């Protein structure tokens, strides 16, 4: 791992100036180790880059990107909101001190328990289907309150021919439609017709998520343009919201871009100012048809691996070395962790 926070001191690795050997001796292994300074610096980079392009900007790291409570607690102190999926992540966000009003509850099959808890806390609920919209409305009415909600959209990028870095033989435009998350485009008319009957929900904005399919700024510009086009058709449902939210999701490559689940890691990762400029320019253009001035919209992003990947590591101890010298030579290092944590399943031989 190459990082300004990772150094070699007297033949041993140190993170943020702290010896990893000493950390292993004190706390044992396996262990996730993060640099607080690296996280602070990366949050500041995101906020500075996007905040200079958009007056109302919120950083919404998902808990799934790093479900370590201590890391999340630091992000809370750094004024980050939180995107959660399921009751476990909601509980994790609360334990990490995230204000409920800064939590968005995602997921395509939320049960009544988590919906009721989210409404009671005052967290936002991201609606994934007309059925779920009716369910949230019914529960909120039973609780004699109004639920703040967003609609998760599945923008069309039919003209984009770029393929995914996860699966280079498949088009991003097809993969973003293939995933189950989000309201099917064929059901948007249904939810629009239903909305006037829902008197216990308040629509505050729209949510989408592409994922780490591409570092190409042109793909990102096409993505946010498609989001804007889709949300404008549903904008009348917003009612009297003063500063509606557009959450474009995430999928930002980390600077090192060393994640092994990405097949195509070629090319330079754009800087965050380059990402921000390209994305915000296209979003401003896309929102030109809105009844709101573009600057009235709150822009949210979910930085994911772009925030976490270069700020820490997984520390493990080599317990044994084995060598095979008969036939094809092999060497194994047996460590006290699991491939589940190292994400090594199916890694080709040429991977570092």
Where are these regions (language model features)?
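Alpha-helix-loop-beta-strand connector modules within alpha/beta enzyme cores
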Residues: 146, 227-233, 275-287
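Non-cysteine beta-strand/loop elements that form the S-adenosyl-L-methionine
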Residues: 85-88, 106-110, 146-171, 201-208, ...
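A charged N-terminal "starter" segment
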Residues: 1-148, 170, 197-198, 202, ...
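Structured alpha-helical segments in the cores of large, soluble enzyme domains
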Residues: 42, 106, 184-202, 227-241, ...
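Short acidic, glycine/serine/threonine-rich loops at helix termini
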Residues: 72, 95, 115-119, 136-139, ...
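Glycine-rich tight-turn/loop motif centered on a GG-T
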Residues: 28-31, 101, 120-124, 164-183, ...
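Glycine-rich beta-strand-to-loop/alpha-helix junction loops that act as flexible
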Residues: 210-211, 246-255, 301-305
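Charged (often Lys/Glu-rich) extended helix/loop segments that serve as interaction or gating elements
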Residues: 278-352
């Amino acid at each position: 791992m190459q990082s300004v926070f990772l150094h070699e001191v007297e033949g041993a690795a140190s993170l943020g100036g702290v010896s990893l050997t000493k950390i292993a001796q004190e706390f044992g292994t396996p262990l996730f180790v993060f640099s607080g300074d690296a996280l602070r610096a990366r949050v500041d980079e995101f906020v500075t880059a996007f905040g200079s392009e958009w007056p109302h900007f919120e950083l919404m790291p998902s808990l799934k990107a790093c479900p370590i409570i201590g890391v999340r607690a630091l992000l809370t102190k750094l004024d980050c909101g939180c995107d959660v999926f399921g009751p476990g992540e909601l509980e994790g966000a609360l334990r990490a001190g995230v204000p409920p009003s800064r939590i968005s509850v995602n997921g395509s099959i939320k049960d009544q328990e988590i919906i009721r808890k989210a409404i009671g806390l005052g967290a936002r609920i991201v609606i994934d289907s007309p059925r779920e919209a009716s369910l949230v409305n019914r529960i909120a009415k039973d609780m004699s309150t109004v639920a703040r909600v967003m609609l998760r959209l599945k923008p069309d990028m039919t003209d984009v021919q770029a393929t995914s870095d996860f699966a280079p033989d498949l088009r991003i435009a097809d993969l973003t439609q293939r995933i189950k998350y989000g309201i099917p485009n064929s059901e948007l008319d249904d939810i629009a017709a239903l909305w006037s009957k829902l008197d216990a929900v308040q629509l505050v904005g729209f949510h989408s998520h592409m994922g780490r399919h591409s570092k190409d700024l042109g793909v990102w510009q096409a993505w946010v343009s498609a989001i804007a086009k889709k949300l404008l058709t549903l904008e009348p449902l917003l009612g009297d919201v003063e500063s509606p939210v557009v959450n474009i999701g995430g999928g930002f490559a980390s600077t090192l871009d060393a994640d092994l689940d990405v097949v195509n890691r070629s090319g330079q990762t754009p800087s965050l100012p380059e990402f921000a400029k390209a994305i915000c320019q296209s979003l401003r253009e896309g929102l030109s048809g809105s009844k709101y001035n573009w600057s009235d919209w709150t822009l949210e992003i979910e930085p994911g691996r772009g925030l976490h990947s270069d700020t820490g590591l997984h520390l493990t101890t080599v317990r044994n070395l084995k060598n095979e010298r008969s036939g094809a030579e092999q060497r194994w290092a047996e460590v006290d962790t699991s491939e589940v944590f190292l994400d090594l399943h199916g890694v080709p031989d040429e991977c570092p």
